[in-house]
A protein has these predicted regions:
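Short proline/glycine-enriched turn/loop motifs at strand-loop junctions of beta-rich domains
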Residues: 28-33, 134-140
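Flexible, low-complexity linkers/stalks enriched in Thr/Pro that connect modular domains
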Residues: 1-6, 78, 83-113, 187-192, ...
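Structural beta-strand segments of beta-rich domains
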Residues: 21-25, 127-131, 225-226
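Hydrophobic/tyrosine-rich beta-strand signature of extracellular beta-sandwich/beta-rich modules
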Residues: 72-74, 183
Length: 226
């Protein structure tokens, strides 16, 4: 089973999920024979095997979301029209529903002097703060960073673990200034959620200028200052 729009030569494995509602089934056989496609006990299509021994079938009407147990039979081209026993079923799931919108990411500072959560609108001296959150296990979280007034850019991704948690840290320093982080969730079928609400932080790792004593005021007494 090949999802439309996928990389040529790639195929869905049994039990996998796709967002493609018109997946293509293909195979090989005896030229002139007819391949019958079944979902459970219901015939949903057929295709004739061409002169090179190949066949393919794509639904003309999009399939609704759900689980499909696909099997094949072959009908001989002879006048008897004998039909083979069905093949071993292959189960696929069609899922076009996007995941729920993720919650706003949490930002954590791990550089002294002040460590811990960085709230929306606050500053941090951590050039590689940790972002974390929760989601559906095995969904992929994509992190977007809008620097200043620029456009949001995808800067990293991480898979939600079996406990529903995720955590991501930039591989390199993210740079001084304002960063607004959002996140999306992508499920196994490739459906991507709308972005989360954003959290804006300001990275400031520059120490203040060294203070200079410019004057000492005091009453003079023999040339000294009391």
């Amino acid at each position: 089973v090949n999802p439309d729009g996928g990389t040529p030569g790639t195929a869905l494995n049994p039990g996998e999920t796709t967002r493609d509602t018109t997946p293509t089934l293909s195979g090989s056989g005896t030229p002139g024979d007819t391949v019958n496609i079944y979902d459970g006990d219901t015939k949903i299509g057929e295709a004739e095997i061409d002169g090179d021994g190949n066949w393919s079938w794509t639904p003309t009407t999009p399939l609704p979301d759900g689980t499909y147990d696909l099997s094949l039979t072959v009908t001989n081209q002879d006048s008897a029209g004998n039909e083979s026993a069905p093949s071993t079923p292959v189960t696929i799931t069609i899922d076009t529903d996007a995941p729920a919108q993720p919650g706003t990411p949490t930002v954590t500072d791990s550089v002294s002097q002040i460590t811990g959560p960085v709230l929306d609108g606050e500053s941090t001296n951590d050039p590689r703060p940790v972002l974390s959150g929760t989601g559906t296990p095995n969904d992929v979280i994509t992190i977007y960073d809008q620097v200043g007034t620029g456009e949001p850019q995808a800067v990293g991704s991480v898979t939600v673990d079996g406990n529903g948690n995720w955590s991501w840290r930039p591989e390199s320093n993210i740079g001084e200034g304002t960063h607004e982080y959002t996140a999306t969730a992508t499920d196994e079928a490739g459906n991507e959620s709308v972005p989360s609400a954003g959290i804006t932080i300001t990275v400031d790792t520059l120490a203040p200028d060294t203070p200079v004593i410019s004057d000492i005021a005091g009453a003079q007494n023999g040339g000294s200052t009391n």
